[in-house]
Amino acid sequence: MTMRVTFLGTSGAVPTTQRNTSSIFVNRDGDYLLFDCGEGTQRQMMRYGTGFAIDHLFVTHLHGDHVLGIPGLLQTWDFNERERAIAIHTPAGTRGNIKQLIQANGTTPSFPVRINEVSAGDVVLDRSEYEIRAIETAHRCASVGYVLDEDDRKGKFDREKAEEEFGIPPGPKYSKLHRGEAVEHEGETIQPEAVVGPARPGRRFVYTGDTLPTESVIEASEDADLLVHDATFAEDRKERAKATAHSTAREAADVARQAGASTLALTHISTRYAASADELVDEARDAFDGEVVLAEDGMERRVEFPDADEY
């Protein structure tokens, strides 16, 4: 089961020659999900080969650098004769704004556009193996972040124990036991828990959008495998970050550290650091012992299982 995250736009409010405005594409085992859609997102999708087969767009807030790509993307789908519905998930109270944004294009899409208002704590998308929840963030307007949480996986099957202790040869009985079914072998009933370990956690991906550092994000990011956090400024601009309801790279790292995240990706990088964002990375690494990466447009990250070393 793959989970790949492609950064389509990693700049702050203004794009640069190297960074587009905010957008992240997630491929979760063939489910294609888009988080935010800044101006030019559809070109980034073409450039980095993600494809356009998304059915769900998750909006963190309505600032232009996160939504101005929506009309163009809808228009392209229309030109390509899309028929499937698209669901746009947006913070509570912003449905009308999304409608106005779409109508400003002067055309009505020929396919269904479903606008779903969400609040912190809502399960926005519920799938058989994962769910996406909205989480509380702190910005200058109605805003949410999103958490993709996978269900627990089956425990690890102990082949050595099955064969050596119970004498069960490799074959169909292994599959049954791993599915949680008891099997009969040489007159003995073998229960699955005898050879299958405890359930193993799935993966957790967190995207904050624009936010101050908050306790709600720390709680939602507990043991996250990948936390993508606002890191607009360096620490010497901390007051500016606070005034504009953003985070510094060190503050993002503090969130990751307190949450016990594995990897922190810094995004929403101010144009102030267009030449080099090394100080953001350095400050984050000073505060967080896990992996720190500076998100770049076109960067792809594979989100591994917490126990990937066991495979």
UniProtKB/Swiss-Prot annotation:
Summarize the protein's role: Zinc phosphodiesterase, which displays some tRNA 3'-processing endonuclease activity. Probably involved in tRNA maturation, by removing a 3'-trailer from precursor tRNA.
Per its record, the protein catalyses:
Endonucleolytic cleavage of RNA, removing extra 3' nucleotides from tRNA precursor, generating 3' termini of tRNAs. A 3'-hydroxy group is left at the tRNA terminus and a 5'-phosphoryl group is left at the trailer molecule
**Keywords in alphabetical order:** Endonuclease, Hydrolase, Metal-binding, Nuclease, tRNA processing, Zinc
HAMAP family attached here? RNase_Z_BN
What GO terms are given for molecular function? Answer: 3'-tRNA processing endoribonuclease activity; zinc ion binding
The entry marks the following residues as binding Zn(2+) 1, namely H61, H63, H139, D210
Write down the top EC class of this protein.
hydrolase
Its family remark reads:
Belongs to the RNase Z family.
Q: What is the lineage of its organism?
A: Archaea, Methanobacteriati, Methanobacteriota, Stenosarchaea group, Halobacteria
Name the active site residues: D65 (proton acceptor)
Cofactor(s) needed by this chain: Zn(2+)
Question: What organism does this protein naturally occur in?
Answer: Haloarcula marismortui (strain ATCC 43049 / DSM 3752 / JCM 8966 / VKM B-1809) (Halobacterium marismortui)
Looking up PANTHER family in the UniProt record yields: ZINC PHOSPHODIESTERASE ELAC PROTEIN 1
Q: Which residues bind Zn(2+) 2?
A: D65, H66, D210, H268
What's the name of the protein? Ribonuclease Z
